[in-house]
């Protein structure tokens, strides 16, 4: 998926009120950028980190700038959670998610009282797929989710279990945005209930999938499947 162009380089000064970030540009000026991420951005929202921001000319926007990428440990990290589903959809449609090659993709499907990211269909078979954006590393090169307690994420796991019990395929797709990651596991020390529910879901037939992205200042796309560690 192509990123907005051109992107403007700067340094993160601070992230605050969840959706705001102050960025120092190369000329020393300070701008405030929208930060489309509701998580803690642990390891990413660190003052001094190099960032790339985009600028919109839309006069109706409150903030002209948007935080797009943050450099962490020499790798660009895509913290723009609104883009994650589009990257996942592109991968699902293009066959990059091997478990669902050839399935038809419909975004945003309501199941029970939850909105699930994708409904997939193949002949008379149906599958629900929920997508999660992963930007945290634990234990060296293992990607972890979540980076904060997520009751919403817990609810999604319960919904996927309900779908599986009803005879549907169900999967949670962790989109790993850390280029150095070699595996994925739940962040049990941050949200132990999420880890418990994920293991329960897998034991009931929900598929836990992890795919790593390749990110540059011009594009981001899914390119590698990672092992999921639940032990």
Curated annotation (Swiss-Prot):
<dbReference type="InterPro" id="IPR040452">
    <property type="entry name" value="SfsA_C"/>
</dbReference>
<dbReference type="InterPro" id="IPR041465">
    <property type="entry name" value="SfsA_N"/>
</dbReference>
<dbReference type="InterPro" id="IPR005224">
    <property type="entry name" value="SfsA"/>
</dbReference>
<protein>
    <recommendedName>
        <fullName>Sugar fermentation stimulation protein homolog</fullName>
    </recommendedName>
</protein>
<comment type="similarity">
    <text>Belongs to the SfsA family.</text>
</comment>
<dbReference type="Pfam" id="PF03749">
    <property type="entry name" value="SfsA"/>
</dbReference>
<dbReference type="Pfam" id="PF17746">
    <property type="entry name" value="SfsA_N"/>
</dbReference>
<dbReference type="GO" id="GO:0003677">
    <property type="term" value="F:DNA binding"/>
</dbReference>
């Amino acid at each position: 998926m192509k990123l907005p162009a051109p992107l403007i380089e700067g340094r993160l000064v601070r992230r605050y009120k969840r959706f705001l970030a102050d960025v120092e540009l190369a000329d020393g000026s300070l701008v405030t950028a929208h930060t489309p991420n509701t998580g803690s951005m642990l390891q990413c929202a660190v003052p001094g980190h190099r960032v790339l921001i985009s600028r919109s000319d839309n006069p109706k926007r409150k903030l002209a700038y948007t935080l797009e990428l943050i450099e962490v440990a020499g790798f660009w990290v895509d913290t723009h959670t609104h883009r994650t589903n589009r990257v996942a959809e592109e991968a699902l449609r293009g066959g990059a998610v091997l478990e669902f090659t050839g399935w038809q993709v419909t975004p945003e499907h309501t199941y029970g009282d939850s909105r699930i990211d994708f409904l997939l269909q193949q002949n008379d078979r149906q599958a629900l797929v929920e997508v999660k954006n992963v930007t945290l590393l634990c234990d060296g090169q293992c990607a972890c989710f979540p980076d904060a307690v997520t009751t919403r994420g817990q609810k999604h796991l319960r919904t996927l279990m309900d779908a599986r019990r009803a005879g549907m395929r169900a999967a949670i797709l962790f989109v790993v945005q850390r280029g150095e990651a070699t595996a994925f596991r739940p962040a049990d020390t941050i949200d132990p209930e999420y880890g418990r529910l994920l293991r329960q879901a897998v034991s009931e037939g929900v598929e836990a999938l992890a795919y790593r992205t390749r990110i540059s200042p011009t594009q981001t796309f899914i390119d590698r499947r990672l092992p999921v560690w639940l032990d």
